[in-house]
Amino acid sequence: YDAILGINASGFADYEGNGTGGLPYGFLKSQGETLQPAVADGWKIIGFDEDDHLQIGEFTDTSNLRDGVEFHPALIINGQNLVAGSGLSDQQPRTAIGQAEDGTVMMLVVDGRQLHSFGISVERCGEIMESYGAYQASMLDGGSSSVMVYNGREITSPTTLSQNPEGRYLPDAFLVR
């Protein structure tokens, strides 16, 4: 894909219950082609339009999106922090994506379930994104899926590495070229 940076994106279907990932769950669109329709009631579609603006919401028409996935919860929409005071305070490995009004894209990945990092809460993710000026932001899949790769090398420590040295197969990702 010739990317310099990437983070995991949507959740995955785990029909056998073994947590290996690999099959996307929910809406998936890549380079203008819809690969899967939306499935989850109340989940948000998170994606970029042709002008690289991050869109987050429950859309029936996704024709304006170039790339997108489906997950929840939205953290910030139109500058409003939706998770402040929500009680979503359990600490886990987390991944989030956001965008400032000037177009700057933000990617947040926090390790968890490890001695060097217990994780972070959804509320804290919202606070961090807000503190960096996110106008739109959403959670992506977390837990053992949370990973950031820079120049082909993992720069975070996914919890799956303790269970499987090859890590978890991810169904999709947001990439920076």
Residue positions per predicted region:
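Gly/Ser/Thr/Pro-rich low-complexity, intrinsically disordered segments
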Residues: 1-177
